[in-house]
Amino acid sequence: MAILQDTEGFYYSTDEYLGNPSDYAIHNARLLASMLINNYGWTDYGCAGVFSAISFESQFNPQCIEGRRSEEYARAHINDAVGVGYVQWTPPYNIITWSDDRGLDWKLSSTQCQKLEAERNREDVQYFTSPYRIQYWQTYTGGTTPPYTMIEYTTATPEQWTALQMAAAWILFYERPESQYNVSNYQRNEEWVTYWYQVITGQPLPTPPTVYPPGTPIEPPSGDGRSKMPIYFYPMFRR
């Protein structure tokens, strides 16, 4: 496996994950948080919420293509169920074509930050709360109001929402995978919200939570009648 460094200082590999959380992933997470906080006004807690998902989707490899496939493959399957980039945009046109149309290089972290910003400002909407609010409220019977917009989410603070609520909101409102009803996914990502918050804020590195390889299936409770799918970005739910 060759680990290289791009012109922006981020480590990447064209054929492998970086490790969860390897020194490479931690390095990239800190740089990415700096971009999002300083250039776009995110909070460290908002970054941590999104990073909890990136831990499983790409392990902070900006050039990650699902299945360790090549860019040529992604371009040949531009409308298919192939995840690309930090958050595994699916289909690939969501990041590759979007970048090409603007004269940008999708492989750069700065480009992927611009894409997230376009989504955040509802220029290219990815964050939906309806009809997924119902599932959120069913999970949190106390009636806690979720972050209704991506701006609310990315500017969140620990005083507003718990790590579990941040994990659940991102899965339900942004990722929308087939396995969205499996609460164990929220609990899995909750640990990583806390982990990345400590990393970003400069606290001593905590012990990482349990590591799952990207694409590890998390089975829903037996007998619930729902499809058992990995927590991939499922195209019928992404727009």
What spans do the regions from the language model cover?
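Enriched but not universal
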Residues: 1, 212-239
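Short, functionally critical alpha-helical segments immediately adjacent to catalytic or ligand/cofactor-binding
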Residues: 44-61, 116, 169-171
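Peptidoglycan-targeting cell-wall enzymes and recognition modules
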Residues: 4-35, 39, 55-162
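Extended low-polarity, hydrophobic cluster-rich segments
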Residues: 30, 163-168, 229-236
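Short, surface-exposed acidic
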Residues: 42-48, 205-208
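Active-site or metal-binding loop neighborhoods of secreted/extracellular toxin and effector enzymes
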Residues: 2, 149, 153-156, 160-213
